[in-house]
């Protein structure tokens, strides 16, 4: 089989395997995440690359638990956690060549979590040669999640009781009707003022400091777009697939297809292609030197 055809083959997860992935995430939440929420001691919180970039003992313990569970289910898969990458940045170089890679954000929104805010989640994605094929956005406090899989129609929301519903992105509209997430601090300082000048064009702008819940709001039609200037795979791979399967349109701002192997660039996720095209034209100045 040629490399090209091998890369095009899909990978699917039987329902029972997906259920076991979810069980592992729930176990991590019950054992490591929820018991420490609003109960962390100062020595259990550490700074990584910047004052707002935090890691807690709960991040480390939950990532270890989820990694162990995924390794047992998929012994041949590459498994990459955010905190593992903090120790070994070179792990990211292996995503593009991996036929199956799991990417874990054990607590997305760690700053919120460490400061007692309830806006945090767990993100798990699977990729094939960098392309997302499975995505899960889990809310530990509500014990519910959004899920999508390549080769399976649509994206779904599953409540803690097991009730399911399909997800659908919004219909969009005029600029002054759009609600979005723009991460101003992720843009180089010389362009921040010009990007800030765009904000009054929109209906509402926000920043949750939590990709998990930003993508959830986009996928369920509550928000219309998200512009990100930092494209860490644990923040985006799952949400990209879920939004696409819910009817959204997601590409890099320069028109490239999204890949979890990308290390730089701007990622624009929108409720539909027409909205994406309008926003791409507005934000195109970010692509100039």
Q: In which residue ranges do the predicted regions lie?
A:
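Short helix-loop capping/hinge motifs at secondary-structure junctions, enriched
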Residues: 153-166, 273-278
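DPxDG-like acidic metal-binding loop motif
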Residues: 95-155
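An extended, acidic
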Residues: 169-289
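Generic detector of well-ordered alpha-helical packing
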Residues: 60, 83, 106-109, 140, ...
């Amino acid at each position: 089989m040629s490399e090209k055809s091998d890369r095009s083959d899909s990978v699917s997860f039987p329902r029972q395997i997906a259920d076991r992935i979810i069980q592992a995430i729930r176990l991590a939440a019950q054992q490591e995440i929820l018991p420490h929420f609003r109960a962390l001691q100062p020595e259990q919180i550490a700074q990584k690359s910047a004052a707002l970039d935090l890691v807690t003992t709960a991040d480390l313990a939950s990532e270890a638990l989820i990694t162990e569970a995924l390794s047992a289910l998929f012994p041949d898969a590459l498994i990459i956690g955010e905190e593992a990458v903090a120790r070994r940045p070179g792990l990211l170089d292996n995503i593009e060549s991996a036929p199956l890679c799991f990417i874990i954000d054990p607590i997305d929104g760690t700053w919120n979590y460490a400061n007692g805010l309830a806006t945090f989640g767990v993100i798990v994605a699977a990729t094939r040669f960098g392309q997302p094929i499975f995505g899960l956005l889990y809310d530990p406090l509500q014990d519910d999640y959004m899920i999508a899989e390549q080769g399976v129609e649509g994206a779904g929301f599953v409540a803690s009781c097991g009730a399911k519903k399909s997800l659908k992105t919004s219909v969009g509209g005029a600029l002054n009707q759009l609600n979005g997430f723009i991460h101003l601090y992720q843009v180089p300082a010389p362009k921040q003022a010009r990007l800030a000048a765009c904000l009054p064009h929109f209906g509402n702008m926000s920043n949750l400091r939590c990709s998990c819940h930003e993508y959830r709001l986009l996928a369920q039609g509550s928000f219309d777009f998200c512009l990100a200037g930092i494209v860490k795979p644990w923040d985006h791979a799952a949400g990209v697939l879920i939004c696409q399967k819910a009817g959204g349109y997601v590409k890099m701002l320069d028109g490239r297809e999204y890949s979890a192997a990308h290390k730089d660039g701007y990622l624009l996720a929108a409720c539909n292609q027409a909205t994406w095209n309008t926003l791409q034209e507005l934000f195109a100045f970010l692509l100039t030197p």
